């Protein structure tokens, strides 16, 4: 899901803390605690009245997109769909993010539809989620159904698609701006097409629309000899800061970023590199600060299941993937909650996330 609008009375400009870092990607050298800013002060520049010239006007007051954090009450949301979902081709970036015991599945079915019974169950679950949200008064929007089995080719690669099940991966809302992430998997290169109708509608209602530089996804973006066999291999590589994506060009998934008012936290992962983080930092500066954090995670990819900010100064931290910088949050007065380990085993998942 992707939250595009929250109640306007929330803590959309709140700052629980402020890092003073050294260079991007390095361990922070300082921490300064800041008090919460008021909603009015934080968003004054975001909600300026529209000028007569629409081509140069500020964001109108009735803009449908307005979300600054992960905890405000929800008004409107984009929920993905599993229809026509395809197994991604077994390329090196897919291999790096899947368990070895499932490699045979990807090798056999890559480029084909997922099993029908799997899709049927997934579609039913998503539809029920939409029904629950609607009953709670939330406006639900859905991406367009697309045939993801169609093969496409660029000067650098060819692939089939995957799905439009996870808008959180591809779209990031920062204030009144929607940012399309460039992605890092070749099978997700054209995934943005499923959301263009929705994004254009938000744009026509005042939202800012930004598309990050699209990577070529040439072979140079990936470590073709990335050594992965065991969990121990993954732990060792992650500890050394080695990932399947290189720094050949910027790439990132929106799901590696998490928002807390004017402070945005991000992890370097298998799909988000430092060039992508630096692009986002420069794009959002000076209004927002982007902080890199890291975890004891053998296969980092998407931050929500590892570290989630669920309220002002309130963090939900996965005990299996502790944050290396967690003491900085504690010193700044944040409350850190470590939930119990779930009873449901993780063995049923095709992905390492």
Functional labels for PLM-detected ranges:
Residues 31, 38-353:
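The feature marks the mature, well-folded catalytic cores of soluble enzymes
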Residues 1-48:
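N-terminal mitochondrial targeting presequence
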